[in-house]
C-alpha cells in the first residue's frame, strides 16, 4: 500500500483501457482513489497516487424501448418459461423501478395501492413511497394467487437472500426471442421515464416517481420535452401571428328576392 506510485496506477489504467474496457479502467481508478483516501485517513500513507490520473472520456448511453420493441417484448414475455422472471420484468416496465428494488419487493411493502420501498432496497438508502398503477396491482394480484406456498417476497427463491437476485439470463433470452439488440434491463427505467414525459409529467414529478434525490439526475430526460414544447410554442406562435394579420373581410350574401 505504501509503495504504490502514481506511475503504477497510471500504467494499470492504461492497461485496462487498451484491453478494450475504458469505462472499467475509470471505475478501477475511482475505487483505488477511495482506498488510498482511507489509507491517508488511517495514517498508512501521506499522498493519494491516483491524484492527477486522466480518466477516459465517457459518453452517457441513452437507449429507450421503442413502441415496436415493446410489442415484441410483451409477446416474448407471454411465452417465456420462467414466469417469475417474466413477471419481474413486467413490473420493471410498469413501475420504472430499479431491478434490485423489484426483486427484493415484499408483500408487506404494498398497501392500499402504494409501494413503500425499504431503505435496504433503494439506491439512496432511504424510504421511497410510490403509487402503483392498476395494471401493476393486477399483476401483483395474479402473482400472489399463483404463489404456493406463500412467501414474504413477491419473487422468492431458495438462496441466502430469500428472493431472486438475478434475471440476466432470462433477459438475454427474451431479447433474443423479441429480436431486440443493445437494450439493458436498466434501460426499461429510462423508457418508463420517457413515457412519463410523453404523458405530460414534469421533471419534479418524474424524479419523485423514480426516487431521485438529486434533480440533476432527472434532468437527463429534459430533452424528451422537445416535442411537447414544440407543440406548445407552435400554438402560441399561431395566436400571435393571427393577431398581427388584418381581419379578413366578411362577405355579405345578397338576399334573393322572393319569386
Model-inferred region functions:
Residues 1-13, 58, 62, 185-186:
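A Lys/Arg-rich helix-loop hairpin that forms a DNA/phosphate-binding surface
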Residues 4, 85, 181-200:
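Short basic/aromatic active-site micro-motif
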Residues 19-31, 41-104, 122-127, 147-150, ...:
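Basic, Lys/Arg- and aromatic-enriched nucleic-acid-binding interface segment
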Residues 23, 41, 90, 94-101, ...:
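C-terminal catalytic core of tyrosine-transesterase DNA break-rejoin enzymes
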Residues 47, 108-116, 181-182, 201-220, ...:
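Short, polar N-cap/turn motifs at the start of nucleic acid-interacting alpha helices
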Residues 56-57, 64, 117-125, 210-235:
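Catalytic-site neighborhood detector that most strongly recognizes the C-terminal catalytic loop/helix
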Residues 68-71, 121, 131-181, 259:
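Active-site/catalytic core of tyrosine-dependent DNA strand-transfer enzymes
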Residues 75, 136-138, 142-151, 156-161, ...:
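C-terminal secondary-structure termini that scaffold catalytic or DNA-interacting sites
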Amino acid at each position: 500500500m505504501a509503495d504504490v506510485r502514481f506511475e503504477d496506477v497510471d500504467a494499470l489504467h492504461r492497461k485496462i483501457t487498451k484491453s478494450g474496457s475504458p469505462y472499467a479502467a475509470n471505475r478501477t481508478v475511482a475505487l483505488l482513489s477511495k482506498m488510498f483516501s482511507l489509507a491517508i485517513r488511517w495514517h498508512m500513507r501521506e499522498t493519494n497516487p491516483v491524484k492527477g490520473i486522466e480518466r477516459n472520456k465517457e459518453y452517457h448511453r441513452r437507449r429507450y424501448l421503442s413502441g415496436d420493441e415493446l410489442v415484441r417484448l410483451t409477446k416474448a414475455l407471454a411465452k417465456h418459461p420462467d414466469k417469475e422472471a417474466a413477471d419481474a420484468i413486467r413490473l420493471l416496465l410498469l413501475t420504472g423501478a430499479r431491478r434490485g428494488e423489484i426483486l427484493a419487493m415484499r408483500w408487506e411493502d404494498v398497501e392500499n395501492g402504494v409501494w413503500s420501498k425499504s431503505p435496504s432496497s433503494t439506491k439512496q438508502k432511504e424510504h421511497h413511497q410510490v403509487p402503483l398503477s392498476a395494471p401493476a396491482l393486477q399483476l401483483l394480484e395474479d402473482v400472489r394467487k399463483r404463489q404456493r406456498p406463500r412467501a414474504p417476497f413477491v419473487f422468492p427463491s431458495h438462496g441466502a437472500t430469500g428472493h431472486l437476485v438475478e434475471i440476466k439470463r432470462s433477459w438475454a433470452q427474451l431479447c433474443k426471442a423479441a429480436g431486440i439488440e443493445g437494450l439493458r434491463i436498466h434501460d426499461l427505467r429510462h423508457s418508463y421515464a420517457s413515457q412519463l414525459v410523453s404523458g405530460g409529467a414534469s421533471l419534479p414529478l418524474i424524479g419523485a416517481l423514480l426516487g431521485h434525490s438529486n434533480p440533476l439526475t432527472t434532468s437527463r430526460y429534459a430533452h424528451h420535452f422537445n416535442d411537447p414544447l414544440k407543440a406548445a410554442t407552435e400554438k402560441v406562435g399561431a395566436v400571435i401571428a393571427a393577431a398581427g394579420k388584418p381581419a379578413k373581410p366578411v362577405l355579405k350574401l345578397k338576399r334573393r328576392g322572393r319569386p
